[in-house]
Amino acid sequence: MFIIVLMSFLVLVVPIPLFLFKPRWPLNALIPGIVACAFIRLFGVEYEIRGQEHINVRNGGVVLLNHQSAIDIVMLSRLLREFRNIVPVVKKELFYMLPFGIASYLVGVVFIDRKNTASAKDVMKREAVAITKDHLKLAIFPEGTRHDNDTLLPFKKGSFHVAIDSQSIIQPVIVSKYHFIDHKRKRFGRGRVIIKIMPEIPTKGMTKADVNELTDRCQQLMQTEFDALSAEAKQYCHN
């Protein structure tokens, strides 16, 4: 936990004065992201990204990610260097975790109030417009909460509604299990994180009637890839 807090402080809080020159710009997070990756590498954790050829920066859309730990911030930082126009969607409560919430706001993070359905829908409708107008990609964790299970949690449907409303693409991105984190013994070991960017899934022509089928399709695809990547990453783990 100390490592996570220290890393978050160094990569988000220290650069806040720089973010003020152009607030809410996603690329504000680029330099902190590089620092985050270098910092965690000191602890023996390496990141490998596959499937960069599937990225089309001209396409706005929804990027689906599995959610495991607070150090997902490093994974998001690494993906920013590939996608460049990607912003995470997170629960509003994180905004009030000062000063991290302010830093997150300044790098363009989108906050939603999950307890207020109407408010959350309004925010996502606004972002759906940005997807089309600004070619923005929203990084969404469809499981809704982080966990360290071997089975992904049932996907919530909000991200799929956003993609269909904007008639944009969905791009699944799967992150291997963090075998190097021992939650029971609270130990942080050495290991490798494998991130796989899958081909885009178009939603053009889809309607609300297709949400359930699309959700199930993405859940099955991501679970299959998660199992395979996690098994491969396990051989690099040294706790």
Question: Where in this protein do the model-derived segments appear?
Answer:
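Short amphipathic alpha-helical coupling elements at transmembrane boundaries
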Residues: C37, R78-R81, I102, D122, ...
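Membrane-helix interface/capping segments
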Residues: C37, Y47-H54, L79
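Non-catalytic C-terminal accessory region of glycerolipid acyltransferases
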Residues: K121-N239
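Catalytic core of membrane glycerolipid acyltransferases/transacylases, capturing the structured
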Residues: V11-A29, L42-F43, N56-T117
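Membrane-interfacial terminal anchoring regions of lipid-handling membrane enzymes
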Residues: M1-L20, P26, L30, E53-N56, ...
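A generic, lipid-embedded transmembrane alpha helix
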Residues: G33-V45
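Generic preference for hydrophobic
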Residues: I49, V63, P88-V89, I195-I197
